[in-house]
């Protein structure tokens, strides 16, 4: 009886399939990472079992890849104890085909590695002078503000042209916005709501720091914009003829502080912990005492139950920064933080 012969073609086909399987397996054996750290290791695991081509197809500049096919325990040790995965291969070695997004460009750094840096298009900017940003800081020009927005403040915008001011004098707000001065005597441009709906409940009434009852928060905002100086909220409900803080009920964990200058009380948030920062600027308060910071002044006010406000920055022995603004800044009773204007 004749033995069956092995077909050489079938054996070759089997070997080809085995090689293809091994090739596919090796192609899927790598790990994809979102960045390469300064120590040269891969960090922030994106996905396992990806080929280099698949990993690098994301187009991210910082994406990197490791070839090692390791278990979960090894990956955990790399990420937690070793500062990342070794043998890290960056997807991008040059700036070719790198898309950094709007306002950024790819440039080779001193170590000859591609990096996305802020490079806003400033060619269409006509005003070359300083501008005041929405963060209350002065920038030497609008291009410098755009760079700051690119780096760390995506919501940063130009409020008005020129340096940030302590008064609304000479502040020209764009569009329909109006200049308002906050508690720290910084000028901001805000949009006034000219139409307020009629209140539907008596619980909407608010007592302003000017002793006037407002039908709603919208009406208080509107009055603030028309005045050009923040009025502020004394307490919720209609204003009453209080003889002391004992007559005023504060809500939301606030404490009543008495303003002896006008004979009225207002509810203030106390219990704030002052940061131990040497960068805080001292302030001269309405009691003619110098405090290490505005926070320290508020802490003293909460402790005594007497309202204190900032007269000017710096020591009480120093001269106020803007003597020309004394006339406009004399009525501190109309002040409260600008954030309150924007949040309501």
Curated annotation (Swiss-Prot):
Stretch forming the signal peptide: 1-29
Limits of the Follistatin-like domain: 94-117, 167-190, 244-268
GO cellular component labels: extracellular region; extracellular space; nucleolus
Composition bias, Acidic residues: 321-333
Name of the featured protein: Follistatin
Start and end residues of each TB domain: 30-103
Keyword DNA-binding: no
GO MF annotation terms: activin binding
Disulfide bonds: 32-55, 42-88, 56-91, 95-106, 100-116, 118-150, 122-143, 132-164, 192-225, 196-218, 207-239, 270-302, 274-295, 284-316
Phylogenetic placement of the source organism: Eukaryota, Metazoa, Chordata, Craniata, Vertebrata
Keywords, ordered alphabetically: Disulfide bond, Glycoprotein, Nucleus, Repeat, Secreted, Signal
The species this protein was found in: Bos taurus
Localisation per UniProt entry: Secreted; Nucleus, Nucleolus
Chain intervals for the UniProt region annotation (Disordered): 316-344
Sugar attachment sites: 124, 288
């Amino acid at each position: 009886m004749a033995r069956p012969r092995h077909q050489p073609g079938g054996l070759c086909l089997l070997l080809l399939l085995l090689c293809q399987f091994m090739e596919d397996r090796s192609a899927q054996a790598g790990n994809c990472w979102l960045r390469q750290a300064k120590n040269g290791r891969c960090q922030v695991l994106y996905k396992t079992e990806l080929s280099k081509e698949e990993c690098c197809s994301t187009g991210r500049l910082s994406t990197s890849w490791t070839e090692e096919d390791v278990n979960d325990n090894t990956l955990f040790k790399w990420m937690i104890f070793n500062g990342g995965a070794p043998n890290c291969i960056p997807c991008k070695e040059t700036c070719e085909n790198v898309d950094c997004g709007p306002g950024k460009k790819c440039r080779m750094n001193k170590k000859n590695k591609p990096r996305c840096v802020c490079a806003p298009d400033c060619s269409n900017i006509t005003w070359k002078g300083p501008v005041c940003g929405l963060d209350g800081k002065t920038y030497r020009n609008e291009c410098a503000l755009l760079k700051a927005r690119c780096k760390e403040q995506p919501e940063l915008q130009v409020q008005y042209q020129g340096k940030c001011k302590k008064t609304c004098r000479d502040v020209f707000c764009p569009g329909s916005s109006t200049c308002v001065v906050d508690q720290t005597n910084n000028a901001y441009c805000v949009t006034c709501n000219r139409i307020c709906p009629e209140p539907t409940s008596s619980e909407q009434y608010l007592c302003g720091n000017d002793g006037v009852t407002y039908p709603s928060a919208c009406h208080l905002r509107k009055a603030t914009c028309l005045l050009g100086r923040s009025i502020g909220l004394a307490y919720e409900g209609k204003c009453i003829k209080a003889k002391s803080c004992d007559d005023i009920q504060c809500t939301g964990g606030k404490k009543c502080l008495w303003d002896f200058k006008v004979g009225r009380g207002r509810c203030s948030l106390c219990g704030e912990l002052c940061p131990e920062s040497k960068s805080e600027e001292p302030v001269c308060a309405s009691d003619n005492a110098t405090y290490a910071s505005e926070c320290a002044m508020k802490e003293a006010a909460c402790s005594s139950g007497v309202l204190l406000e900032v007269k000017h920055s710096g020591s009480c022995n120093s001269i106020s920064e803007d003597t020309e603004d004394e006339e406009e800044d004399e009525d501190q009773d109309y002040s409260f933080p600008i954030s309150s204007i924007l949040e309501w």
